[in-house]
């Protein structure tokens, strides 16, 4: 088991961001080294957390600026496991849960003034997990990997406006790598195999400028073959 506490600062041309971090957890490894389990509970308390937001200034212009959220916090749980089914095959499973909130976040200099107090922190799904299956041939000449990851819905902007929300989604990836020699290999792959449509970033515009935003999406399904020669 373990317990840690740390304090850190992030500097810039604005108030320093301060973080008090506390973690309590356990680590386990079986006697045959086939099973590894790490679990931890954490609490992160931020003071003046730095956030980049596009706002309308008092002069009426649109500007992207860095602001300090007065108080914000994140609590959660992490679980990481590895299990070797055989000498050649392993399963990895990771799970994360978090509860986040801006305890105090007001921008009085924006027009109109903005109040994000009580909102969920951006890019913070309540739960997420990923699982992967990896098997290696007896002679180490080929590797098959199948992976799936999932995230609950979350917001990409501290305003928590609907346009910045990403619905829950899952992504599957598959790859097979064959080593012919020390310097030649071939990889057959499929990324985002179910062709999931999901956002990777959202730029939101201030309400006096229409209140809309610009969405950036992940790559669609890709299937291909890579042949690599190293020198």
What does each model-found stretch correspond to?
Residues 1, 32-37, 88-91, 139-144, ...:
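Repeated loop/turn-to-beta-strand initiation elements of outer-membrane beta-barrel proteins
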Residues 1-28, 32-37, 41-67, 106-109, ...:
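Surface-exposed extracellular loop regions of Gram-negative outer-membrane beta-barrel proteins
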Residues 3, 24, 37-41, 81, ...:
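Membrane-embedded beta-strand positions of outer-membrane beta-barrel proteins
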Residues 15-17, 27, 42, 70, ...:
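Surface-exposed loop and edge beta-strand positions of immunoglobulin-like domains
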Residues 19-23, 72-80, 124-130, 169-173, ...:
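Transmembrane beta-barrel architecture of outer-membrane proteins
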Residues 45, 67-159, 194, 228:
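Gram-negative outer-membrane beta-barrel transporters
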Residues 149-156, 177-231:
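C-terminal beta-signal and adjacent terminal beta-strands/loops
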């Amino acid at each position: 088991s373990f317990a840690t506490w740390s304090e850190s600062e992030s500097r810039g041309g604005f108030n320093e961001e301060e973080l008090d971090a506390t973690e309590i957890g356990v680590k386990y490894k079986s006697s045959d080294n086939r099973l590894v389990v790490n679990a931890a509970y954490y609490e992160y308390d931020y003071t003046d957390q730095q956030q980049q937001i596009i706002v309308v200034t008092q002069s009426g212009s649109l500007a992207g600026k860095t602001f300090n959220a007065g108080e914000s916090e994140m609590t959660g749980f992490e679980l990481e496991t590895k299990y070797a089914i055989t000498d050649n095959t392993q399963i990895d499973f990771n799970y994360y849960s978090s509860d986040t909130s801006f305890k105090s976040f007001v921008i009085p200099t924006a027009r109109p003034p903005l109040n994000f107090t009580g909102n969920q922190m951006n890019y913070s799904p309540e739960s997420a997990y990923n699982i992967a299956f990896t098997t290696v041939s007896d002679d180490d000449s080929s590797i098959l990997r199948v992976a799936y990851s999932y995230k609950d819905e979350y917001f990409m902007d501290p305003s928590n406006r609907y346009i910045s929300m990403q619905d829950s989604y899952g992504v599957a990836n598959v790859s097979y790598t064959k080593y012919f020699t020390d310097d030649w290999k071939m990889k057959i792959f499929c990324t985002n195999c179910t062709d999931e449509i999901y956002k990777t970033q959202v730029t939101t515009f201030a309400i006096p400028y229409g209140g809309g935003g610009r969405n950036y999406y992940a790559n669609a399904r890709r299937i291909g073959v890579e042949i690599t020669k190293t020198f």
